[in-house]
Structures are given as C-alpha cells and as structure tokens.
C-alpha cells in the first residue's frame, strides 16, 4: 500500500499492509537529506539540468508498485498506488518541465464570469481576480506550464505501472480515482475550494 493514514501520512505502515512496499509522503521526506527536503518544495528545482525523475515522489511510488507486481504476479493481490503530484510544487523532469511553455487556454466565456449569481463565498475566493481583465486571468505562466507538465509526468508514471500490470497480470482489475483539479482561472477562480464547477472536479 503506497499511501499513509491520510493525505500526508505519518510514516508508519498500518497493520495489514506490507511494510516493504508501503509508502507515504512522510516516508519520502525521511529518505531525503535536509537539503533535499528544501529542494522538494521548490518548483525551480524542475529547471535544473541535473534534476532527475528519480528525485520525485511519483517515480518512487511507481518503482515500488512495479517491484510489488513483479514479486506477487503469481498470487492474488491488492495494490493501491497514490501519487502526490501534480500538487504543488509540481516538480517534474525534462521534457515535461518545458512541455507547455507559453501555453494558455482558448478563450472561454466563463473567464469573465462576475460570479454575481454564485454564492458570496466564491466572490471572496476570487479576490482581486473578481475585477481583473480577462487577459490577466487567462495567460501563460511558468506556474501553469509546470503544473500541466507535471500532469503529463504523472500520466507517464501511471503508464509505467499500467504497462507492468499488462505484462504480469493482464486480467487484473484496475480502478482509477482522483480527488480534484484546479480551477486555473475558470469562473475567475484558482486552486480548489468548496465549489462543484466541473473544472475543479475530476
């Protein structure tokens, strides 16, 4: 099992799970030096020439999952793999770190939503963006590029696990779930919050 007692985890493998493969964010951070712990929270690390996928949480989760599948391919098993990425700081190696440079979304009417017919909480959430020009909301940025690149990187890492499943357990049932997306300027909103807009729900 590759997730902890909650989103972050406490570094302790719960009873009933295999400690040789169990992994959470606390376990990941414990593997890092103090210097690398700081780097693991800095999006600029993605642009350094020596930044490797092996540094990322996603890569390490996939590696454990692949080893688990190789070990238990001839037995009945349950495997849960949970990734932290693309959550910020959206670390990802080349070529994903520059894959979406300069990208911006096609114009959409909801970038100009004044939220006047939405709950007051959403207008508070929008903050200064509530009265910003459309070009200030829908624009290219390093943050957007890295976030989208990290999404593609996680797709790649998930693909590595799926490829191994096809190889060693082609009859396995795969269930894919996710928690939420990012508003990315839709309805003048960013990040996530208590709203049921399709842009923020997966």
Give the positions of each predicted feature.
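Catalytic-site neighborhoods of secreted/periplasmic enzymes
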Residues: 1-52, 191-192
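Active-site regions of oxyanion-processing enzymes, predominantly non-cytosolic
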Residues: 4-24, 57-114, 168-173
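Histidine-centered active-site microenvironments of extracellular/periplasmic hydrolases
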Residues: 89-94, 164-202
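Beta-strand elements within well-structured catalytic alpha/beta cores of enzymes
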Residues: 77-82, 147, 151-154, 158, ...
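Short glycine/proline-rich turn/loop motifs
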Residues: 39-50, 125-145, 202
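Acceptor-binding helix/loop patch of EC 2.4 sugar-transfer enzymes
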Residues: 98-136
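Catalytic metal-binding/acid-base residues of hydrolase active sites
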Residues: 1, 84, 181
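A long, amphipathic alpha-helix that forms part
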Residues: 56-70, 107, 133-172
